[in-house]
Amino acid sequence: MIALLSPAKTLDLTKPNLNIETSKPIFISEAEVIMNNLKELEIQDLCPLMKISEDLGVQTFTKIQDWNTIYYGDEKPFVLSFKGEAYRGLDADDFTKEDLEFCNDSLRILSGLYGALKPLDGTKAYRLEMGTKISIDGSKNLYDFWGNKIMEAVLKDLENHKEKVIINLASNEYYKSIKKIDKKVRVITPVFKERKGIEYKVVTVYAKKARGQMVRYITKNRITKSEDIKNFDLDGYEFNERLSEGDTWVFTRD
C-alpha cells in the first residue's frame, strides 16, 4: 500500500537537527532537462507562465539559476521542507527516524519537476506546478513530458508491498499525471467533508490538511492494509459508510 500526496508551493530549507541520510530523486535527469529549459527564461517570462507576482518571479528566477544536480546526502528531506496545509496536517517535524523510514516506503509525493519524490529525497529549492503550461523539448505540457514514467515508478515501488493498493491523497492536478494507474491496481480515494447545516461538504483548506493527517495516521500506526485507514479518527473525522461509494471513501466530522 502506497499513499500519494501533492507537493506544496512553499519550502522551508532550515536544516533540522536530524541524523538521517537523504537520497537523490530517481528522476533527477528528467528534472535537469526541465530546469535547463526554465533557465532560458527571464523573470518577465516566468511571472505570466507561473501566474506569480514580480517579487515572487525574482525569487523563482534565482532558485532556477541556482538549481543543480549535486547531492551530498545531508540535504533537508522534502517531507520536512514542504510547508502547506497538507504538510501542516502531516506534521512530520516530530517524526522519529523510524517514522521517517516507514513514511519513506509508504508515501510518494508527486511533483511537476521531479515526477515522484520519496519523503527522504533531499531538497533543492524550486517552484513548478504540474499544471504549468510549459513545453519541454517538444512536449505539449508537463503531463505530456512525463507520460507514463511517474505511474511506472509508483507501480515498481508497489511491487515491494504486500497489498497492491494506492491511497490517493493527491489533488486532481497531480493525480492526473498517473490517472491511468487505476487500470493497473486498486485506487482508494479518501474524501474529507464537514457538516454544513443538514449536508456534508468539502471545505478545501480542511480537506488539504486532512490529507496530510491521513498520511500521519498511516505512518504513526504503521498501517499496511487499506481497510485499516477506515479507523482514521484525527481531528474528529470518522469513516462515513453511508456517503462512501466504491473506492471513494468519505470521512466526515460534525
Swiss-Prot record:
Matching Pfam families: H2O2_YaaD
Domain of life of the organism encoding this protein: Bacteria
Gene Ontology biological process: response to hydroperoxide
GO annotations of cellular component type: cytosol
Family of the protein in this entry: Belongs to the UPF0246 family.
Entry-linked PANTHER family: PEROXIDE STRESS RESISTANCE PROTEIN YAAA (PTHR30283:SF4), PEROXIDE STRESS RESPONSE PROTEIN YAAA (PTHR30283)
Protein's UniProt name: UPF0246 protein CPE2152
UniProt source species: Clostridium perfringens (strain 13 / Type A)
Organism ancestry: Bacteria, Bacillati, Bacillota, Clostridia, Eubacteriales
